[in-house]
Amino acid sequence: MQFARYILTALLWLPITAYANIGQVADQKGNGAIERGRDLVGSGVGTEIQSMDAAVTTNGTMRIDFIDDTRVDITQHSKLIIDEFVFDPANDIGSLSLKASLGTVRYASGQIAKKYKQNVKIRTPSATIGVRGTDFVMVVDEVGGSLITLLPSCDSAGNCYTGEITVETDAGMVIMNQAFQATATQTSSQPPTPPRLLDLPEDMIDALLIVRKKTPWVEDEEEWKKAKKIGRAHV
């Protein structure tokens, strides 16, 4: 009886962040779902997200807004796993671990990356990305090969900048700090390719930026042109 009471007390003291809602589906078009343990939960705008969830799309797209202002955009036939999310600014605690395991996922930094960047791990099957408060997109193929591209970041006032990321495997690391600079990784045992600037036509820039122009990321067409101009200045 005393042992049972001890177990119950220990369970009551488990961090609530393990089961708390850490964000929600802010936009969805077409079919998508949330894998939660052994359950598959149909998703839509307003669906709550928990740590250890996996967001999956088939012929749809999804955007998730986290409570620390981190945002991820997930395109068709993609999967994003939320391995860990802890955000407690009152106690100066924050950590985030995500894995893009298939398809195309765009990541935009929130408060955790800005305040606790050492506690942020963004992964693909073949690479780990170190984040220093910026946006980037990951494209992951069926065997885990990954293309990581750094993107310009713009606020709702139209102010744009390019941050910096590191892309690392067991065999090496590269640093990227120019908009539309990209590197590829085939396996975790091979080094990333040297970063190169992508020479992109206008429609491909639109695709890589994953159409945030209809969300608060960029308010109007003029601000949208500013964002693309920053990228094209480097290509």
Over which residues does each language-model region extend?
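C-terminal interaction modules
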Residues: 1-8, 14-20, 40-44, 91-95, ...
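N-terminal domain-start segments of secreted/luminal proteins
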Residues: 18-56, 60-65, 69-72, 85-91, ...
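His/acidic/aromatic-lined binding-pocket segments of jelly-roll/cupin-type domains
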Residues: 23-25, 54-56, 72, 97-98, ...
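A short, compositionally biased
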Residues: 26-30, 57-60, 115-116, 155-164, ...
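Flexible glycine-/small-residue-rich
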Residues: 27, 76, 100, 133, ...
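Long, low-complexity intrinsically disordered regions
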Residues: 114-136
